[in-house]
A protein has these predicted regions:
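Acidic/His-rich, metal-assisted hydrolase cores and their charged scaffolds
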Residues: 1-229
Length: 229
């Protein structure tokens, strides 16, 4: 069984090193307003990248969103996150006092347009601690999960109306997918040499493309299984 989420993407996915370089460039050259970065709360390595970058450029990180706060705390407790003292704080109404806006980096949930996420509340003026104003920059350090396009675009439009600048992976290399592209799928099939191959995790279109990719590296048509539950 093989994940089909990235099956329509040709070539190879970008490396985390490239993403880190793009994020560093954004943080380094950000001199006006707050920098708000939306990311998956489970992507702890991305949080570590941002911690290291912000420490390098003397920025303070604020966490927004329950799952972000909880996952970061768990990762710290287990030793998966290395955090310099004083660089990271939980977002509260008083937490940012005395810190210039351009020195604030807010890592938030809501990269998929979730209705009750922290970023969604910011875009609608309902966040208890953050009011989006002209000069703020919002970075979507994520890919849009298929099916979430409308929700994400809706939030982007609301943020722009409030005066924020929005950066996505279409503008800069601020995210690499957690799912294999076609060339990586071929490599896995060639390494494992399965007798049977079942594309999973994707609608019929994505799974069919994945099956077609498998056929190009020698899988037999009768051994490729397209199954609906």
């Amino acid at each position: 069984m093989s994940d089909s989420t990235g099956s329509v993407r040709k070539g190879f996915s970008k490396s985390e090193k490239e993403v880190g370089e793009a994020l560093e460039g954004i943080v380094k050259n950000h001199h006006k307003g707050r920098l708000i970065i939306a990311a998956f709360s489970s992507w702890i390595s991305r949080v570590q990248q941002l911690i290291d970058i912000c420490h390098k450029y003397d920025k303070t990180i604020f966490l927004s969103g329950r799952s972000m706060v909880e996952n970061v705390q768990i990762a710290k407790d287990l030793g998966y996150l290395k955090v310099k003292p004083g660089i990271m704080k939980k977002m509260t109404p008083k937490a940012t006092q005395g810190i210039p806006p351009h020195k604030q980096v807010i890592i938030t949930t809501g990269s998929q347009g979730e209705e009750f996420s922290a970023l969604s509340r910011m875009s609608e003026g309902r966040h208890p601690s953050i009011e989006i104003v002209k000069g703020d920059t919002v970075v979507f350090s994520s890919s849009i999960v298929p099916g979430n396009e409308k929700s994400v675009v809706g939030i982007i439009n609301k943020l722009i109306k409030l005066g924020a600048k929005v950066i996505t992976k279409d503008d800069r290399e601020v995210h690499t997918g957690g799912h294999a592209f076609q060339e990586e799928q071929k490599i896995m099939i060639q390494l494992i040499k399965p007798k049977y191959f079942m594309p999973v995790f994707g609608d019929l279109y994505f799974r069919t493309v994945h099956k077609d990719t498998a056929l190009t590296v020698g899988m037999k048509e009768e051994n490729c299984l397209l199954i609906d539950n």
